[in-house]
Regions:
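Transmembrane helices of ABC transporter permease
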Residues: 1-7, 41, 112-166, 239-250
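Membrane-integrated ABC transporters
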Residues: 1-15, 27-38, 56-60, 64, ...
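Transmembrane helix-loop-helix hairpins at lipid-water interfaces of multipass membrane proteins
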Residues: 2-52, 132-137, 248-252
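Helix-loop-helix
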Residues: 28-37, 130-144, 218-287, 292-293
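Alpha-helical transmembrane segments of multi-pass membrane proteins
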Residues: 45-64, 115-122, 141-169, 219-222, ...
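Short intracellular "coupling" helices and adjacent cytoplasmic loop segments at the cytosolic face
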Residues: 65, 73-97, 101-103, 176-200, ...
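An intracellular "coupling" helix at the cytosolic face of ABC transporter transmembrane type-1 domains
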Residues: 84-88, 101-110, 114, 118, ...
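ABC-type nucleotide-binding domain
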Residues: 301, 307-554
Length: 554
């Protein structure tokens, strides 16, 4: 790519020198016999330049496309590898803008700006040397004219970098608002907050518009300056050059070659503003992307594989905090779940139930103690083997914009049709067979074409289909009516009998699925026993279940 570009510059700069030879030779001396070979040489150089431009563009497009694809792949893989802690701190719109608009900015610079930055600098240096060799007084005039351009360019670079960063950050904020409005449109309509949300969007859009106008205004002033200086220099060179020809200091051919070479500098100089602007935007985009690529993942693969897991799950003095300077959310957690045991986790809202269940598949890592499966610390296991042994279904089910079948088989793509139907029956999700195109029906983004209960049942079917050694159900029955819940619970008994289960429960009927019940209060397990034992001996447990039942039936 660069080699063809450099050759192209060399060929284009040779043409004015051939023109000088034609004017000062055959034309001035009227030697027609020399005109044909020199003319053919000029024609050959022009054709060569065209071919080199074609080769450069082909190589340029392929190289840049490959680079963009590689960067996008690396960025996506990195986003998938980063832990929940990272994603909880970042707005999805900011991440989206980095994967899309920032990569496009880098692609444009690598495909156009970087190449021409190198070519133009090379051309400026070579042409300046040629101008000085052709007639040094006029060459000095060109050099003097370049000084203010360099000074202004350096000042422009600093200002443009700062304003480009503001524009790109505001684009990310606006993308976040658009995404949140699209995902939460039902809530917006239900509460009649369309105008309120629209005003928030308009405020962000106006802010972005004003910053973008400031950016264009700054660039326009710089580009105008770059237009004026070369044109003034051309006028001066024409005047002084004509005088030099009149005094026979240089030949007419030399003046024509000088002016032709000088005119070849106009594009590099005029494009300097555009290229520097692109460079600053690309630097800003690269910095924004580096914020993701350079983030260290705190949750990484361990050295061991979990082979033929039995599901013996233990919590040993487990504690957890979200950040080093925060208080413990969980502390002194000790539980022992032999294979095939189901534990119901009961606690008030905010007591840490969801956080505790998230520690098992290492969505977060414990900050104290350890969790083991079959005697292996989960931190010593590869993430693939751990998460194939642990399946989770959450109270807020996530479905993807794909078919119902693809959503269900996400954790087990090779599942047979019989296994899929069995999982649907257990989760009471056979309604999926009655969708317009059956299981091949696309459920829309976040599964918005389905009801809350339907989404929850599909998510439960997905977890059941995975056939894990450890099954974590984080209040996955909360959106079901009493009748459907009873049917699901009856089917789940058979599933839980063959696996180790943790069930976050708010209703007595769900608690009855478990062999043991653990009461979580103030971030720690205060009581463990059967439902009957806790109901008889722990007033706080009775009060909590009674309150939950009243809320359900209210």
């Amino acid at each position: 790519m660069f080699s063809t570009a450099i050759l192209g510059v060399g060929v284009s700069l040779t043409v004015p020198l051939v023109t000088r030879a034609i004017i000062d030779g055959p034309v001035t001396r009227r030697e027609i016999s020399l005109l044909l070979p020199l003319g053919l040489l000029a024609l050959g150089l022009s054709i060569s330049e065209v071919l080199l431009v074609w080769m450069r563009r082909w190589a340029q497009s392929k190289t840049v496309s490959d680079l963009e694809a590689t960067l996008r792949h690396d960025l996506y893989v990195r986003l998938q590898a980063l832990p929940m802690e990272f994603h909880s701190r970042w707005q999805s719109g900011q991440l989206l803008s980095r994967v899309t608009s920032d990569l496009s900015i880098i692609r444009r610079f690598m495909g156009f700006g970087l190449l021409f930055l190198v070519i133009n600098i090379l051309q400026l240096v070579v042409v300046t040397i040629l101008l000085l060799r052709l007639y040094w007084p006029l060459g000095v005039v060109v050099l003097v004219a370049a000084a203010p351009i360099i000074i202004v360019s350096l000042k422009f670079e600093k200002k443009y970098l700062a304003i480009s960063r503001r524009v790109q950050d505001q684009q990310g904020d606006l993308a976040t608002r658009i995404e949140e409005s699209a995902v939460g449109f039902r809530v917006i309509k239900a509460f009649g907050r369309r105008e309120h949300v629209k005003k928030q969007f308009d405020d962000g859009a106006v802010k972005l518009y004003e910053t973008s106008v400031d950016k264009v205004r700054l660039a326009s002033r710089f580009w105008t300056f770059l237009e004026v200086i070369p044109n003034l220099t051309l006028v001066i060179v024409l005047l002084l050059g004509a005088l030099a020809v009149g005094r026979h200091s240089i030949t007419l051919g030399t003046l024509v070659a000088f002016i032709t070479l000088m005119l070849s500098l106009i594009w590099p100089v005029e494009s300097l503003g555009t290229i520097l602007a692109m460079a600053q935007e690309a630097m800003t985009s690269a910095d924004r992307i580096s914020e993701i690529l350079d983030t260290e993942s705190t949750i990484t693969d361990g050295p061991d594989e979990l082979v033929n897991p039995r599901g013996h799950l233990r919590f040993e003095n487990v504690s957890f905090r979200f950040s080093p300077d925060s208080d413990d959310v969980l502390h002194d957690i000790n539980l022992d779940l032999p294979p095939g045991t189901t534990l119901a986790l009961v606690g008030a809202t905010g007591s840490g139930k969801t956080t505790l269940t998230a520690l098992v598949p290492r969505l977060y890592d414990v900050t104290g103690g350890r969790i083991t499966i079959d005697g292996h610390d989960v931190r010593d296991l590869t993430l693939a083997s751990l998460r194939s042994a642990v399946a989770s279904a959450f109270d807020d089910p996530t479905l993807f914009s794909m078919s119902a079948r693809e959503n269900i088989t996400l954790g087990r793509p090779d599942a047979s049709e019989e296994d899929v139907q069995q999982a649907l029956e257990i989760a009471q999700a056979t309604f999926a067979n009655d969708l317009p195109w059956g299981l091949d029906t696309r459920v829309g983004e976040q599964g918005m074409s389905l009801s809350g209960g339907q989404r929850q049942r599909l998510a439960l079917a997905r977890a059941v289909l995975a056939r894990p050694a450890v099954l974590v159900l984080d209040d996955t029955l909360s959106a079901l009516d009493v009748h459907t819940e009873a049917l699901v619970e009856e089917a789940l008994r058979n599933v839980l009998a063959a696996t180790t289960g943790i069930v976050v429960a708010h209703r007595a009927s769900t608690v009855m699925l478990a062999d043991q019940v653990a009461l979580l209060q103030d971030g720690t397990i205060t009581h463990v026993g059967t439902h009957g034992e806790l109901l008889a001996t722990v007033p706080a447990y009775r009060t909590l279940l009674a309150a939950e039942e009243e809320e359900v039936h209210a």
